[in-house]
Amino acid sequence: MSETTQTSQSLYQALWNSADVLRSKMDANDYKSYLLGMVFYKYLSDKMLFFVSETMEEETESLEEALAVYRKYYEDEEIHEDLLAVITDEMSYAIHPDLTFTALVERVNDGSFQLEDLAQGFRDIEQSDELYENLFEDIDLYSKKLGATPQKQNQTVAAVMKELAVLDVAGHAGDMLGDAYEYLIGQFATDSGKKAGEFYTPQPVAKLMTQIAFLGREDKQGFTLYDATMGSGSLLLNAKRYSRQPQTVVYFGQELNTSTYNLARMNMILHGVPIENQFLHNADTLDEDWPTQEPTNFDGVLMNPPYSAKWSASSGFMDDPRFSPFGKLAPKSKADFAFLLHGYYHLKQDNGVMVIVLPHGVLFRGNAEGTIRKALLEEGAIDTVIGLPANIFFNTSIPTTVIILKKNRTNRDVYFIDASKEFDKGKNQNIMTDAHIEKILDAYKSREDMDKFAHLASFEEIVENDYNLNIPRYVDTFEEEEVEPLTEIVAKINQTNATIESQTASLLDMLGQLHGATPEADEELKAFVEAFKG
């Protein structure tokens, strides 16, 4: 397959096939960093080579030709410094010709490749600009997982690079490559199973959440979007699909896991998000607040936090403005409301929309959580509650709920949608289709009662239910069974009895034809038949 004829689907497949080299050596949660890191390095390398060709007005048909052009001008003492300055100014990095992905693959092919060359390439990128600082720190090229000896490690990495060499990643820059990267992340999530929840939100859920956040504001310039538990950044980057001004969206994200944080940084760059429009932070959302410098409040807040995580719940947090207005702290064993209150705190007063996914327990659990829920309801903060189907996430089979929050609402009613049956059965998971998502969105826009699907509950109704938001209290999905006439039931019983009598007679007839091998056995058999007759 030529580089220029690769479709996005074949690009996806080729990327995933390159993982075969690593799949037998470690689980997906480990090898994702290696593969995604090398894809990213190839992208930076290829992009730079083609940029040099364009800058020097040299036509090149392949990466090999582009590398030859780069070498020629790099080695020209008269323009060497100027060339590097132009590259660095445009790219924020420059790669030595011998350390480009294309040059390294040439060495793979002639058997002279050394791991240290790739490691040096990684270091050079990391040291070139703050944007790339520590970006490859999770990729241990000398790990025993890659092979028991340095030679084996060298062979494994070389094999992956050889697979990746055929990919036209620079030609697919922007959303196509970004989407291919998303595809890889999704495949890793499928392979990783339970561990996947920390870095990936399934696309159907992300689609629903993002469309809700942007509803009526698709044309807004400079839309600010915040995810305090951003994982790989997939949820944030859905904005590019639903904003009509995608290049003006400004992304704010925080992630505790360093490996996942680096994944999000790569994801942003591969999606072509301008550097000035991405503000990502590697820290614990439930520790010190972030961001604390303007802007601190956002047009949209999207969150899929780890469910029922533990946190310190230190008494000092009662003085924290994120939590203090709500009377209690989320319990130590369940940080769900701590995440929710953090996101809500960072929501804009006017027209801000927060969409968060949490387990159903937050809707009805008592004690501290009941106090927080009551305070939110009395403030009118909770706008809509959507019950999602069970088993649609990678990390849990439990049903989850999407909660939509807004500030400065004029009333305190809550709209309930029971979408628990809106799915198709998949091989390992339930799947929400576009039709299911549209049905939910249509209901959300209308805010009308729909039989066995949606209900607009007044604040008085919620108070009557003691601030319990369990969806079945508001949306009755009970299906009455059709009453069967007694005459039909009696007829069925008679038919069943007749069938039993007929089959019993047939069995007795067959038993009567049996004979024991000895007189004693024959007598025992006859006694059994008589006992069976009753």
Where are these regions (language model features)?
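Hydrophobic helix-cap positions at the C-terminus of alpha-helices
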Residues: 22, 216, 346-347
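Conserved S-adenosyl-L-methionine
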Residues: 195-303, 308-317, 323-329, 337-338, ...
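A conserved structural/catalytic subdomain of Rossmann-like adenosyl-cofactor enzymes
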Residues: 2, 6, 288, 295-534
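Non-catalytic, mostly N-terminal accessory regions of nucleic-acid modification and defense proteins
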Residues: 1-213, 276-285, 387-390, 412-420, ...
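Generic hydrophobic, helix-prone segments enriched in Leu/Val/Ile
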Residues: 119-123, 252, 274, 329, ...
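Short glycine- and Lys/Arg-enriched binding-loop motifs that mark or flank ligand-binding interfaces
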Residues: 33, 193, 227-229, 249, ...
